[in-house]
A protein has these predicted regions:
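Extracytoplasmic
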Residues: 239-241
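Non-transmembrane functional regions of envelope-associated proteins
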Residues: 2-223, 227-229
Length: 241
């Protein structure tokens, strides 16, 4: 006896329906960001479980409540930062990252700028940050340190980080800049000073003729392999004396 034609086609129809449903679920997941959220949750979980000791040759000098209570309200005189750099040099610091945007002269004490520039020069290995300049909502250029500081510094690096849609920073671009990705990320700028052979693994991108030189350019995206929460890194409050 021959089977009815409808029963022969039923498995095909069912598999087609299942396949179509899977495709639709995948499309909806991609549009709604469900897969991205799952991926980031797994990534965060792996990083939380994977801990490694913080480097013992890195110290964070923080601007915290104790520092503000001791020195006074922000912003501080640049003589304070100069004194801190001098103390770091005397203590034998191999390098200093001064994570402050120094794009304008000191309005109340011009001599403080020269004091800070001298301290940067004498230390010999100070890295300064640069960042994006904006006009309204548009990126319009670069915010760089004043020449007096840039000339004294050993290196300048960009301080941009990438924030994901959930507001968490998990990655950076190792090279960025307006018109061309010419500036290393500030941590890479430090590595280039202290361990140039290790930094050679992250060379600058080739200069392309097809780049839009009126746009902010980025290259070499990298997820940050966090060693854990910030607490393990030795941190001390600012004490200039």
């Amino acid at each position: 006896m021959r089977a009815p034609a409808s029963s022969l086609h039923r498995p095909t129809v069912e598999w087609f329906a299942v396949t179509l449903l899977c495709v639709l679920l995948t499309l909806v997941s991609a549009v709604e960001g469900w897969l991205w959220r799952i991926d980031q949750t797994l990534y965060d979980g792996v990083l939380s479980a994977w801990t490694q000791p913080a480097s013992d040759d890195v110290v964070i000098v923080s601007i915290d409540d104790a520092s503000l209570a001791s020195i006074g309200r922000w912003p501080w005189s640049r003589r304070v930062h100069a004194a801190l750099i001098d103390l770091a040099r005397e203590a034998g610091a191999r390098a200093v990252v001064l994570d402050l945007i120094l794009d304008a002269p000191s309005p109340d004490d011009p001599g403080a700028d020269m004091a800070l520039a001298r301290a940067i020069h004498h230390q010999g290995r100070v890295v300064l940050p640069m960042t994006q300049a904006t006009t309204g909502a548009m990126l319009s250029g670069e915010v760089r340190p004043l020449d007096v500081f840039a000339d004294a510094a050993a290196a300048i690096g960009h301080s941009q980080v990438e924030f994901d849609p959930d507001g968490i920073a998990r990655s950076v671009y190792l090279w960025e800049g307006f018109g061309a990705a010419r500036h290393p990320q500030i941590s890479l700028a430090l590595l280039r000073l202290l361990e140039p052979e290790a930094a050679d693994r992250f060379p600058p991108p080739p200069a392309g003729d097809d780049l839009d030189h009126q746009q902010w350019q980025r290259a070499n995206w990298l997820r940050m392999p966090f060693s854990g929460p910030p607490e393990p890194t030795p941190t001390i409050p600012t004490r200039p004396s």
